[in-house]
């Protein structure tokens, strides 16, 4: 899994899987899911991230491997 914050685009992208993306669907305004050819979600894009989560809070994210 990879997480990318693009400050210029004001977007957060979470890549769950490296399989090719064949379809994308906006499930809510500004939230887009990417799917592979097996209809599995492989990516999540959140637009307008600065309005949803303050940038300073994003920088504090902690990750846990389970």
PLM region spans:
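Short low-complexity stretches enriched in small and charged residues
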Residues: 1-4, 44-46
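Structured beta-strand/loop patches that form or line metal/cofactor-binding pockets in enzymes
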Residues: 2-3, 7, 12-26
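Short, acidic, Ser/Thr-enriched surface-loop or helix-capping motifs
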Residues: 7, 35-36
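Short connector loops at helix/strand junctions that flank enzyme active sites
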Residues: 9, 28, 56-58
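Hydrophobic/aromatic beta-strand elements that line small-molecule binding cavities or substrate pockets
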Residues: 30-33
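C-terminal structural segments of small proteins and small subunits
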Residues: 38-65
């Amino acid at each position: 899994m990879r997480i990318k914050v693009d400050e210029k685009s004001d977007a957060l992208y979470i890549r769950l899987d490296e399989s090719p993306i064949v379809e994308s669907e906006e499930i809510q305004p500004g939230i887009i899911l990417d799917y592979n050819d097996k209809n599995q979600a492989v990516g999540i894009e959140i637009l307008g991230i600065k309005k949803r989560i303050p940038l300073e809070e994003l920088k504090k994210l902690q990750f846990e491997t389970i």
